């Protein structure tokens, strides 16, 4: 597939997502559909409810893909969609009181869970910054930077295990329960996210955290 073919295929895929998965009422995108694009809340095999119609993970990876396309497709349509998507994440998915993402949400963005996912939060800090940079709008960049650095600080203070360099998985602020499991991807996202926070703020603690996460991942997750 040549570059032009790939670009056209990407545009067609975006058109399908906008037609079948985009929510024109509350903005954002539904979590899942059947093969015929029929709306189908994702509950099979997981402890979720049909009201969990939107997830931050879905929006994280959609904005990652849309941002990648915007680098090549500078059309007003893509610029507007990426801007809208970024502000949905900043205004609807980030909980600015505690500087973490809401995990699962109803169609109207009401939170349906209280868990915090440190891996997704630190991942989002560099992904949203990347989106704002590609978007190239000063106000969006300022708002995104402030939000993301607050999130990075919260991840560092609450999710980064300073004694060995591990990034914790999930935490329930209501029950105080932390997941005992660690995953490779959370460590890798922490490497990138803390490195980005150091580049933005110049605070050495983030560089130290990035390096410690790297060493922890290399020691425990690389065979």
Regions found by a protein language model. Give the residues of each.
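Glycan-recognition and catalytic cores of secretory/periplasmic carbohydrate-active enzymes
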Residues: 1-223
